[in-house]
Amino acid sequence: MKVAANSSKMLAEKLELMKGGRRRRRRSRRRRRRSRRRSRSPYRRRYRRRRRRRRRRSRRRRYRRRRSYSRRRYRRRR
């Protein structure tokens, strides 16, 4: 009987951990929101600008006619 009782308790604890218990959920959500706000504003904007400049320079040298089409498509997507 003891073994069965322990196994049921272990299963209940595992389910709570998988669901992410109330305490853990609140902490994780707050941390994620803060980290996303901080990372989006300074880091991602600089990174995207650098990437676009590099791609435009490389495409000007290789494909002069296709450049206009690629720029229009990028603006529509992003």
Curated annotation (Swiss-Prot):
**Cellular component GO terms held in the UniProt record:** nucleosome; nucleus
Q: Which residues form a coiled coil?
A: none
Name the major location: nucleus
Q: Which UniProt keywords apply?
A: Chromosome, Developmental protein, Differentiation, DNA condensation, DNA-binding, Nucleosome core, Nucleus, Phosphoprotein, Spermatogenesis
PTM statement from Swiss-Prot or TrEMBL? Phosphorylation occurs at different degrees. The triphosphorylated form may be predominant in T1. SP1 appears to be phosphorylated in elongated spermatids, but dephosphorylated in mature sperm cells.
Q: Compositional bias (Basic residues) at which positions?
A: 20-78
Q: Please give the residue ranges the record annotates as the region Disordered.
A: 1-78
Q: Segment Hydrophobic: which positions?
A: 1-21
Q: According to the lineage, what is the superkingdom?
A: Eukaryota
GO terms, molecular function: DNA binding
The alphabetized list of GO BP terms reads:
cell differentiation; chromosome condensation; spermatogenesis
What tissue specificity does the UniProt entry give? Answer: Testis.
User: Where would you find this protein in the cell?
Assistant: Nucleus; Chromosome
Q: What does this protein do?
A: Cuttlefish spermiogenesis is characterized by a double nuclear protein transition: histones -> spermatid-specific proteins (T1/T2) -> protamines (SP1/SP2). The protamines compact sperm DNA into a highly condensed, stable and inactive complex.
Protein's name according to its UniProt entry: Spermatid-specific protein T1
The beginning of the lineage is:
Eukaryota, Metazoa, Spiralia, Lophotrochozoa, Mollusca
